[in-house]
Swiss-Prot record:
Entry function: Involved in the third step of the chorismate pathway, which leads to the biosynthesis of aromatic amino acids. Catalyzes the cis-dehydration of 3-dehydroquinate (DHQ) and introduces the first double bond of the aromatic ring to yield 3-dehydroshikimate.
Species, as recorded: Streptococcus equi subsp. zooepidemicus (strain H70)
Protein name: 3-dehydroquinate dehydratase
One GO process term, biological-process aspect: aromatic amino acid family biosynthetic process
Annotated catalytic residues: 118 (proton donor/acceptor), 143 (schiff-base intermediate with substrate)
Entry keywords, A to Z: Amino-acid biosynthesis, Aromatic amino acid biosynthesis, Lyase, Schiff base
Length: 226
């Protein structure tokens, strides 16, 4: 299970002052570009990609529809993604599939897609259908993050992940049940078939994230021999 940590600068000065040494034990860097004004994203990009040269980067524009900090039309969203991809070719591009279906056809040739779905309110009854629809598109990663209202919601998310991974062993999944109640799902990726777990450093990017230091300790215990 790979550890993912976010960088969330709000301006170019913050981007230039990122302490990359804090990320040495992280496998993937997620640049949450939605913390910037939309007109600043392209100009701040060089600082991010230079800071983390040689590291695997996920470019994410988390929009307000899915708990993020930026509001964009479908076309603005896809155009920004395509511009960043054309210049920097990040290892992964997050695409909010259900929020921007109307422009998904423009992403069909992208080999680095993380098709994502986030629901900060609930674990929807049609969660299995969401898994199925995104898995059929065979992106590089299927990412699902939902908010549990009960213990059963957490178990459902974990069971669906295990089931779809078993049926689609070549497909990568990154799934999590959010909040304190769902924290167990962030630790059990190796059991259920989720390839990534998202951690916090100075500031969490989603509710229920475990700190990098705690995650390292937990994984050491889980992965150690008897």
């Amino acid at each position: 299970m790979k550890i993912v940590a976010p960088v969330m600068p709000r301006n170019v000065e913050e981007a230039q002052s990122i302490d990359v040494s804090k990320y040495q034990d992280v496998n993937l860097i997620e640049w949450r570009a939605d913390f910037l004004p939309k007109e600043d994203i392209v100009s701040v990009a060089p600082a991010i990609f230079e800071k983390f040269a040689g590291r695997e980067i996920i470019f994410t524009l988390r929009t307000s529809q899915e708990g993020g900090h930026i509001t964009l039309s479908d076309q603005e969203y896809v155009d920004l993604i395509k511009e960043i991809n054309a210049i920097y070719n990040p290892d992964y591009i997050d695409f909010e599939y259900f929020s921007h279906k109307a422009v998904f056809h423009e992403m069909l040739d992208f080999p680095n897609l993380v098709l994502s779905y986030h629901n900060f309110d609930e674990t929807p009854e049609n969660l299995m259908e969401a898994f199925s629809e995104m898995t059929k598109l065979a992106p590089r990663v299927v990412k699902i993050a939902v908010m549990p209202q009960s213990e059963q919601d957490v178990l459902d998310l974990m069971n669906y992940t295990r089931g779809f991974k078993t049926l689609n062993p070549e497909q990568e999944f990154a799934t999590m049940s959010m909040g304190r109640l769902g924290r167990l799902s962030r630790l059990a990726g190796d059991v259920v078939g989720s390839s990534w777990t998202f951690v916090s450093l100075d500031q969490a990017s989603a509710p229920g994230q475990v700190s990098l230091a705690d995650m390292k300790r937990i994984l050491h215990i889980l992965e150690s021999e008897d």
